[in-house]
Amino acid sequence: LKTGGTSFYRFLENNYPRDASIRDDAFSELHRLKEDPTAFAQRLHQLQLITKLHLDFSSVARQQEMDPSLRVVTLLRRPVARCFSMIEHWRRVPEVHMATLDDVRRELVLDARSMPADAFVEKHQQRLSDHQSKMLGGVSDHVANPPREPLLTAAKANLTSIDYVGLTEQMHETASCLSSAMGFFNSMSSERLNVTRDDRRLTTAEKERIHGPLSELNRCDASLYAAGEERFWQMRARWKLHQFVAASSHQPTPLPHGDVLRFSMDQPLVGDGWHEREGGPLQSCRWAGPERQSTLFLSCCPQGQLEIRVSILSVISDAVLTSLRLSVAARPVPYEIHQQGERLILTATADLPEAATGWLELTFSTANTYSAYDIAGIDDHRQKTIAVETVEVRQLGSC
């Protein structure tokens, strides 16, 4: 899978010898080999790092079969922003490179330069629709209008086979997470490569005209991006925990049978995706947000069956509860919610079949976030979901 941008794959290449990755003078050889998938896969297998190529998931799957130790990273981008970027890319191709383009790409470049943006989108819908879903679903860009539901199902299933999922909009944090996980030196630069000249950029008016059609063309990509966001947030939360553990002498302790670990938002927080602590008429709490996913790491090593009780002081919108998901150790678990005085109490039972050796990971996810300004016109624009007061974990027994 293309790793999402020149800056990012240059960062990856900095961690390998020059001949361990694809050299710029090797592209003609690789393009010839593409006609023979087996020979192409074998040639790529000789490399330590594969970047620059636009590969769909079928190529990735072949590499994974040849080398189970292969690690795959991809960056997803907000679909409409990606389309804006691609149109600007085609507009900026230098004249000196025109002779090297095939007929399809030459037409794209000439049309991007000469046609109104909305006419260009209308003509080249196939190239601008659900590209990331096609890549992850193993479907060529040349396939016109693949059925959306099977495409999205395949893309999301294959996304689970990607080791590291990052976001173009969070490229520096993605690089930090990957450096920590892979033992790389983080050489990610703030320098922007392949910058589009102002006269080749889409104007604000052009973007407004084509935003709606592009959103409609990329409904699968929008859903795929949302799934990718959750993978990225999980990776970022674990990276922050790793940084904390490396710098701290604190070690989680076993949770004996029948004992209860009680965590209050009065205590120091180890987690990600939470607003600052707030004091209220009842007790301190933290709002989950601003993203749709919030993670809390608890300092215990439970095993077997657990009972979890979460005290929720407030919910920004009733719509949050209809989509709220709870995961324990990255496994979705069912839960019940009941009213207790001024609070909502969420209760769940989770089974951890393997003895845990580290922190207990609790994740709260929702379909959307809201602000007090959105809901009631209050001058508070922070995106929030639920306000958590306490979390209790009881060790019930071993599996």
Could you describe each region identified by the protein language model?
Residues 28-29, 333-356:
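Extracellular carbohydrate recognition and processing domains
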Residues 4, 78, 166, 178, ...:
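Generic structural signal for small/hydrophobic residues in well-ordered secondary structure
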Residues 246-303, 316-317, 367-399:
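Glycan-recognition and processing domains
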Residues 22, 28-75, 81-190:
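PAPS-dependent sulfotransferase catalytic domain
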Residues 34, 52-58, 187-250:
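PAPS-dependent sulfotransferase catalytic core
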Residues 48-49, 352-364:
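Noncatalytic modules at the cell exterior or secretory-pathway interfaces
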Residues 1-32, 294-295:
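N-terminal pre-catalytic "stem/leader" segment of glycosyltransferase-like enzymes
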Residues 319-332:
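Short, surface-exposed beta-strand/strand-loop-strand elements in extracellular ectodomains
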